[in-house]
Design a protein with these regions (language model features):
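SAM-dependent methyltransferase catalytic region
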Residues: 1-177
């Protein structure tokens, strides 16, 4: 990805969700339609991300979130913003994301770094990890677990409190590993 520091500079008062959306729209304008199709890329509209976040109500001092198809982090940002405004907001949020498009990682990192700064200003500790692999392929064995326990998820150091995701935007063949 080319360095466009003016694109990656947050505006004063900009919500992390708005920033991630803006960076995502810029990135989408730099890649071809076949590229977007290959990676199943779809920009989640901010109102949809906000609605999805509004459905989550985890309680506790720490929240662990999974975003298995992060993109630039619009869904994760919307969820973290929502949690930060909860009457009993968490003191710590840990986010594990998966993103297969390595060219998108600088934009993902920019969005999550801005989210971290935004949350720290609200006295919430924020950590994140970006896994550059396919969540389904990396966790196929656990996802096929007949017990439904997901006990073998690769990033499962401890259970997740919430997962936020769009469906995949490409068809997965039946014989896919």
């Amino acid at each position: 990805m080319r360095n466009h520091s003016n694109i990656f500079q947050p505006f004063v008062g900009e919500r992390p969700t708005e920033y991630a959306d803006r960076v995502g729209r810029w990135y989408a304008s730099t890649v071809t339609e076949p590229h977007k199709k290959k990676y199943g890329q779809y920009l989640t509209p901010i109102p949809v991300a906000d609605f999805m976040a509004s459905l989550v109500d985890p309680k506790g001092p720490a929240v662990r979130i999974l975003d298995p198809g992060a993109g630039t982090g619009v869904l994760a940002c919307a969820l973290c913003e929502k949690l930060s405004s909860h009457p009993v907001k968490p003191r710590a949020i840990a986010l594990v994301t998966y993103e297969t498009d390595r060219a998108l990682i600088p934009a993902t990192t920019a969005g999550l770094d801005y989210l971290k700064t935004w949350l720290v200003a609200r006295e919430i500790t924020f950590t994140y990890a970006i896994e550059t692999k396919d969540f389904v392929q990396a966790n196929a064995r656990a996802l096929d677990d007949s017990q439904g326990t997901f006990s073998q998820i690769a990033s499962l150091e401890e259970p997740f409190d919430v997962a936020i995701s769009n469906p995949p935007y490409f068809k997965i063949p039946k014989d896919d590993p």
